[in-house]
């Protein structure tokens, strides 16, 4: 079968870094070709070359079997190559139609006036093609992330794209929205569109992809059918067989209760929530998107106000007027959006680790004890196995897994005994996930009380000693970690009455 697009021996270097080294890749018409690899494997660089953002240094690119040089994003669009970025490029104050045809709006009267009727009509044709029930005149700011993504796909198709690159398209979608996206992808496949699908999510790739190409350290490791066992694909990605963590659930029933939450309420998003976590325990929170898990975490951390309820740390009632009160009591929170909450991406590693604790190193209230700051930072980098060239490395240049570890280090320096992890591995590759899992278990072994909120049920099952399930702001069930299954958790996640028994 002739490839829509193929690359052979493609190489690309940046100052001091060889990003791509003799890469091979091809995409056929009417297939979903998944591209997998750890962060830094070269996936994004390859896609940016195909999309015209970067120019290759050497190698060959073929479009419909003919050599081609892609000189710019506009040139890529003219060649029917479209890309849907993970971070959407839409303007909230404009309508869906205006976003799709921005800069190339249909006009009449010799180009003097915008032909708004045709603009909306052309957009409606695109939406009809996708079976998308959406008015072209809807402002982007009024749409969910999932709907905005559909608009991005329609925008790419407005250039008559035959090659569509999708970068982590389900990162912010719930299960129903993922099903809708997959329906559209299958429809585009049936029309002969070739789709490059970049994702870390193994289960999704097996559902939607036809083939998988694995990259590592800037090179192509191989291309295999999507039916290939995932352990084999993971081994290709990381260059080794990942150790399957053997789940051991310790008996923490006699341990001190570090965190106790009673009668927590906030409107309809948190409704009479009760739970406790003991020293050395990992408590998982499962539920569908919008169930209230993050809202509970933010309330316990003092980030959002509550209507009623109490929070106790080591038996002592604490007043939560702000996150500072929670931190002072020994509660640390790792947000699901670490780049906006929790990590100062423009600052270096050392500053991120020590900034909240600087008062500890003030001499006479005036001078910072810089050697002590450097020592504790170096200690944390070693303890958490943070991969960074130096303490002065800017945090945004670290991989997702190492950024997460820097945030953990910050709370450990603060001596927090209760650590709340909200989506701890979101956007993190499979090798780094394994490191984060190992770290969470080590922290529990050291006597920390850990709360893990995750939308990935296999992750909840792998980590949790106990699992609480939420639906519509209530806790609808508690399941012991050694008997929990995806089926039992999903049943509880769709159950609307609250848990009758007291949660211990």
Curated annotation (Swiss-Prot):
Question: Might you report a single GO cellular component term?
Answer: plasma membrane
* CDD domains listed in its UniProt record: ABC_Carb_Monos_I, ABC_Carb_Monos_II
Q: Name one Pfam family in it.
A: ABC_tran
The function of this protein is: Part of an ABC transporter complex involved in carbohydrate import. Could be involved in ribose, galactose and/or methyl galactoside import. Responsible for energy coupling to the transport system.
Q: Which Gene3D superfamilies match?
A: P-loop containing nucleotide triphosphate hydrolases
| Originating species | Albidiferax ferrireducens (strain ATCC BAA-621 / DSM 15236 / T118) (Rhodoferax ferrireducens)
Sections of the chain in a coiled coil: none
* InterPro entries found in the cross-reference section: AAA+_ATPase, ABC_carbohydrate_import_ATPase, ABC_transporter-like_ATP-bd, ABC_transporter-like_CS, P-loop_NTPase
Matches recorded under SUPFAM superfamilies? P-loop containing nucleoside triphosphate hydrolases
Q: Which GO terms describe its molecular function?
A: ABC-type D-ribose transporter activity; ATP binding; ATP hydrolysis activity
Annotated ABC transporter domain ranges read 5-242, 252-497
Q: Where in the cell is it found?
A: Cell inner membrane
Q: What keywords were assigned to this record?
A: ATP-binding, Cell inner membrane, Cell membrane, Membrane, Nucleotide-binding, Repeat, Sugar transport, Translocase, Transport
The entry sums up its family as follows: Belongs to the ABC transporter superfamily. Carbohydrate importer 2 (CUT2) (TC 3.A.1.2) family.
Q: Which superkingdom does the taxonomy of this entry point to? A: Bacteria
Q: Which reaction does it catalyse?
A: D-ribose(out) + ATP + H2O = D-ribose(in) + ADP + phosphate + H(+); D-galactose(out) + ATP + H2O = D-galactose(in) + ADP + phosphate + H(+)
Topological type in the membrane? Peripheral membrane protein
EC number from the UniProt entry: 7.5.2.11, 7.5.2.7
Which cysteine residues pair off into disulfide bonds? none
Q: What is this protein called?
A: Putative ribose/galactose/methyl galactoside import ATP-binding protein
- PANTHER family attached to this UniProt entry: CARBOHYDRATE TRANSPORT ATP-BINDING PROTEIN MG119-RELATED, D-ALLOSE IMPORT ATP-BINDING PROTEIN ALSA-RELATED
**Record: residues binding ATP:** 37-44
């Amino acid at each position: 079968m002739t490839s829509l697009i193929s690359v052979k021996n493609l190489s690309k270097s940046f100052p001091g870094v060889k990003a791509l080294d003799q890469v091979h890749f091809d995409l056929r018409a009417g297939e979903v070709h998944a591209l997998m690899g750890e962060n830094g494997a070269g996936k994004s660089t390859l896609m940016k070359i195909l999309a015209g953002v970067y120019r290759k240094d050497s190698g060959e690119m073929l479009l419909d079997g003919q050599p081609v040089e892609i000189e710019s994003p506009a040139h890529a669009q003219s060649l029917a190559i479209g890309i849907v970025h993970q971070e959407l490029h839409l303007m909230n104050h404009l309508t869906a139609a205006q976003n799709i045809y921005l800069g190339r709006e249909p006009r009449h009267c010799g180009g003097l006036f915008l032909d708004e009727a045709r603009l909306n009509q052309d957009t409606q044709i695109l939406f009809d093609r996708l079976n998308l029930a959406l008015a072209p005149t809807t402002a982007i700011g009024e749409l969910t992330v999932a709907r905005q993504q559909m608009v991005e796909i329609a925008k790419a198709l407005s250039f008559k794209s035959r090659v569509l690159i999708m970068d982590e398209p389900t990162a912010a979608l719930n299960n129903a929205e993922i099903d809708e996206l997959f329906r559209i992808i299958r429809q585009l496949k049936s029309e002969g569109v070739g789709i490059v699908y970049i994702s870390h999510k193994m289960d999704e790739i097996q559902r939607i992809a036809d083939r998988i190409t694995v990259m590592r350290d800037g090179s192509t490791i191989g291309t295999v059918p999507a039916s290939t066992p995932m352990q084999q694909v993971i081994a290709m990605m990381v260059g080794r067989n990942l150790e399957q963590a053997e789940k051991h659930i310790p008996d923490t029933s006699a341990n001190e209760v570090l965190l106790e939450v009673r009668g927590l309420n906030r409107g309809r998003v948190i409704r009479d929530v009760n739970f406790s976590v003991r020293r050395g325990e990992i408590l998982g929170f499962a539920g569908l998107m919008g169930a209230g898990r993050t809202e509970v975490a933010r309330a316990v951390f003092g980030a959002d106000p509550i209507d009623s309820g109490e929070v106790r740390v080591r038996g002592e009632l604490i007043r939560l007027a702000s996150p500072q009160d929670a931190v002072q009591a020994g509660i640390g929170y790792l947000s699901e959006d670490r780049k906006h909450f929790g990590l100062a991406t423009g600052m270096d590693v050392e500053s991120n680790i020590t900034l909240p604790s600087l008062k500890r190193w003030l001499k006479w209230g005036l001078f910072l004890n810089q050697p002590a700051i450097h020592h504790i930072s170096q200690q944390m980098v070693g303890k958490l196995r943070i991969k960074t060239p130096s303490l002065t490395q800017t945090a945004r240049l670290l991989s997702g897994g190492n950024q997460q570890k820097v945030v953990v280090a910050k709370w450990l320096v603060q001596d927090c005994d209760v650590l709340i992890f909200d989506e701890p591995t979101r956007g993190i590759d499979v090798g780094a996930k394994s490191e984060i899992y190992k770290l969470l278990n080590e922290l529990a072994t050291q006597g920390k009380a850990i709360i893990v909120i995750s939308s990935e049920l296999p992750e909840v099952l792998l980590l949790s000693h106990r699992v609480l399930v939420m639906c519509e702001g209530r806790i609808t069930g508690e399941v012991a970690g050694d008997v929990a299954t995806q089926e039992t958790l999903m049943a509880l996640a769709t159950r609307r009455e609250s848990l009758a028994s007291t949660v211990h």
